[in-house]
Amino acid sequence: MFELRKLPYDTNAFGDFLSAETFSYHHGKHHNTYVTNLNNLIKDTEFAGKDLVSIIKTSNGGVFNNAAQVYNHDFYFDCIKPSTGCGCGGSCQSIDANLQAALEKEFGSLENFKAEFIKGATGVFGSGWFWLVYNTKNQKLEFVGTSNAATPITEDKVPLLVVDVWEHAYYVDHRNARPAYLEKFYAHINWEFVAKAYEWALKEGMGSVSFYANELHPVK
């Protein structure tokens, strides 16, 4: 059975990006509901005792939706970090040299990467996610937009960064202003986590996805 992961930071430490109230609903209620639903759906089925990624890749319907949303939310919450308090909007953050070189090779510059990321995430219609992934088939970085619970790991693409654009992720703090939320998100990206995800993607490919998920949700 799966458990709701603990967040690795103080939910009061995100300034005007996200409030503790948002975390209480997003993590404490929405994310928790996906975990609870998944446990109820897989009990006494062929999915009981399987690891999270295996369930995602071999299921459909309600089981898939809830399993994928557990993973998607886990990853999103690791992609953000608290405010630095410097007021720079994230410009003072250092990015791993290998990751920066890969981003500049694929997108031209970090400025262009940011512009394309925010444009792509703004353009996701309705509820969904916007990802930076490592494509294991062509060994390139690319953007992927997914709707509802869909996740790129079903296409053998390794997530490196994701932003949640379901309205419950930002409505308490930003109402319907998704672009404003995305600007704040970019200033709170946990680049150390993204760099580590990229490093493991290069070393282990899709195996890195299972390693990450199993660290949070060991099979019991």
Swiss-Prot record:
Entry keywords, A to Z: Iron, Metal-binding, Oxidoreductase
UniProt remark on cofactor binding: Binds 1 Fe cation per subunit.
SUPFAM superfamilies: Fe,Mn superoxide dismutase (SOD), C-terminal domain (SSF54719), Fe,Mn superoxide dismutase (SOD), N-terminal domain (SSF46609)
Cofactor: Fe cation
Enzyme class: oxidoreductase
Oligomer status and interactors: Homodimer.
UniProt-recorded name of the protein: Superoxide dismutase [Fe]
Organism annotation: Campylobacter jejuni subsp. jejuni serotype O:2 (strain ATCC 700819 / NCTC 11168)
Record lineage: Bacteria, Pseudomonadati, Campylobacterota, Epsilonproteobacteria, Campylobacterales
